[in-house]
């Protein structure tokens, strides 16, 4: 695997592959990789001639009181994992490489990006959309791979690509989970032993939402209320977002019918924010209907 830190060198390296007619897949990350990231790499490796992974902790998507300085980093470990995963090129620029001057241009998807997680992290998704657009411009991939764990982010990127006619296929990859169901995340390392134990309630809260839907509850507000009550059973859990939405538009709706439903959770444990979600098809919910 070749590690590249400058835009010019990366463009030169990719030009050779383009001239040879090879397809390029991009896996954008902020590093400190886990098995969820490696599933993105596995998908990219199986679907492209050349795989580029990027590691860049993007300051534009961190708020003033967020964990930019503390975000976990271990480039040597990440390089080893990516090499073992069959990545051809690692693009690992510094902030001065990506943003040599203060950014005057921002890409924003304001409607999708201002609700749910965006409501408690203002500006976050504009930072995500801006850096992803810049990576797309630099790499010009045929396909780009994102985890479904960050479902709102995935839908924002899909809408951005559609609106701007960016020539890339966005591939969503199902969430990879730990043994107790907790979604794999680089931020899981922040959890204390007690917080990690408590965090298992997050996937169980998704189970509770699915059980309620299977039992015939059709009012989103009632399901949200009961999921909040379920989370209240864990004293260390501080839910910030519990929302049922349309999985395509992320908009609220009046009543559950036969269409798929997105349940999205944003829960704090101490200083750590955990995201999770599930798309539930009411007619095929995994839990037996309650009489």
Swiss-Prot record:
It is found in: Cytoplasm. It is an enzyme of class 6 (ligase). (R)-pantoate binds at residues 61, 153. It comes from the Bacteria. ATP binds at residues 30-37, 147-150, 176, 184-187. Its EC number is 6.3.2.1. It catalyses: (R)-pantoate + beta-alanine + ATP = (R)-pantothenate + AMP + diphosphate + H(+). Pfam families: Pantoate_ligase. GO terms for molecular function: ATP binding; pantoate-beta-alanine ligase activity. Keywords: ATP-binding, Cytoplasm, Ligase, Nucleotide-binding, Pantothenate biosynthesis. PANTHER family: CYTIDYLATE KINASE/PANTOATE-BETA-ALANINE LIGASE, PANTOATE--BETA-ALANINE LIGASE. Catalyzes the condensation of pantoate with beta-alanine in an ATP-dependent reaction via a pantoyl-adenylate intermediate. This is Pantothenate synthetase. The lineage of its organism: Bacteria, Pseudomonadati, Pseudomonadota, Alphaproteobacteria, Hyphomicrobiales.
